[in-house]
Amino acid sequence: MTTGLSLDEGKVIEGRPKALRDKVLIVFSNKVFNREEILFEVFGVEDNAGKQVHRGVDWTTKYYTVTIDVYVDSFSNLEDWTNEFCDPDFDELRDVIAGWIIVLPFSGNIEEETKALSRLVNNATSEDFFTAILATELNVGKNERAFLEYNVLAGAVELVHNELDSDGELKEVNGVDRVKEIIDTCDWHPRLLRTAHLESETGMESACTGISLAQIMGSLREARTKYMAMDPGLDREEFANEMANELSKLL
């Protein structure tokens, strides 16, 4: 996989192959206190010491297996996190993400959260991109809930609620189960898929398994800043290609 370094107007270097989308980003509100449980139930990975990148996670259905990287992040304020993540410096990061899952409680005035989520959807870089919102709490009135669902549907976002049935169990199509269904139906690139009829080879382990999401985002910002400060010319393009190769090892 090779990722192009973003240029002045966010364009990928001409002629560079398009990156495959083999990452899933899950982002937790700091108000979610069972993130370890959710992370394990969805992806089967441990939330060890706040680890932000889990590489080589096999996602298996009845029909296929795909190996993905799971990126984990958190926020105290969704609007602030959205403003940073939608920054042009992180075009390359968004270009390799197949979808994201936002986990947060909804309570009281939800207009701010809805606006931030709408901006995230607008920055989705592919029609095949999925967005799921796992609402750990939906403590809002009927009007607020209708407002949320209207805006969610308008933005092609799927709202999932951890709602309990009369026996205290999660309903089959709600909560974590529904999030997993959404990932199951993701339109993965054929090159990423391994089916029951094909022998799969284990993918190469990344040399950057210890790299955090914060370090990746920092490297993207640093590379873009240096690129923009250089004079146009051959040296600038050579730097762009070198950085693209280096950054592709991180993503």
Curated annotation (Swiss-Prot):
Disulfide bonding pattern of the chain: none
Gene Ontology molecular function, alphabetical: protein-macromolecule adaptor activity
Keywords per UniProt: Chromosomal rearrangement
Keyword presence, ATP-binding: no
Keyword Protein biosynthesis belongs to the record: no
Domain of life: Eukaryota
UniProt GO BP: vesicle-mediated transport
InterPro entries hit by this protein: Irc6
UniProt record similarity statement: Belongs to the IRC6 family.
Role of this protein: Involved in gross chromosomal rearrangements (GCRs) and telomere healing.
Protein name stated in the entry: Increased recombination centers protein 6
The species this protein was found in: Lachancea thermotolerans (strain ATCC 56472 / CBS 6340 / NRRL Y-8284)
